């Protein structure tokens, strides 16, 4: 699963105090990064190639799709990473699908089935039929889905 690669790559990039991180350019990764950006964990998202962000916008075609990357600006506060950790909740061997009411309990910090609830200042990210979104947006829209990860 490509998202698990992104989780570990982001954590390693933050720990190495990098200013930019490069991740594969695909729709699911872009949606995940957009949620992280809106939640304040990333400072920017840019498209580019394997050498760096594009200076001028470049269209992705069949000829260049293998070299296209997303370049993420990593955010720090007083020299410390804003993102402390990003952990997978659903795994290929164990999917965690929750209903809207179970998502609400999970967001309140209560244990749902075999998954511990969110801690204070932790953000849950959910894959719904409308795409990847934060747990707050899923609850507002009364959507259930697959809990992908938790971020703090």
Curated annotation (Swiss-Prot):
It comes from the Eukaryota. InterPro entries: Ribosomal_uS8, Ribosomal_uS8_sf. Its main location: mitochondrion. SUPFAM superfamilies: Ribosomal protein S8 (SSF56047). GO terms for cellular component: mitochondrial small ribosomal subunit; mitochondrion. Gene3D superfamilies: 3.30.1370.30, 3.30.1490.10. Belongs to the universal ribosomal protein uS8 family. This is Small ribosomal subunit protein uS8m. It comes from Schizosaccharomyces pombe (strain 972 / ATCC 24843) (Fission yeast). The gene is mrps8.
């Amino acid at each position: 699963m490509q998202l698990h690669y992104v989780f570990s790559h982001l954590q390693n990039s933050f720990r190495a105090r990098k200013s930019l991180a490069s991740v594969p350019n695909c729709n699911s990764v872009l949606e995940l990064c957009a949620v992280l950006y809106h939640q304040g964990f990333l400072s920017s998202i840019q498209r580019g190639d394997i050498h760096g962000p594009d200076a001028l916008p470049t269209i992705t075609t069949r000829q260049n799709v293998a070299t296209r990357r997303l370049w993420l600006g990593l955010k720090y506060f007083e020299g410390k990473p804003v993102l402390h950790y990003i952990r997978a909740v659903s795994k290929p061997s164990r999917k965690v699908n929750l209903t809207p009411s179970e998502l609400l309990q999970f967001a309140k910090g209560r244990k749902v089935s075999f998954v511990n609830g969110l801690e204070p200042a932790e953000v849950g990210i959910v894959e719904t039929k409308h795409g990847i979104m934060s747990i707050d947006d899923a609850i507002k829209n009364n959507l259930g889905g697959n809990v992908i990860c938790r971020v703090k």
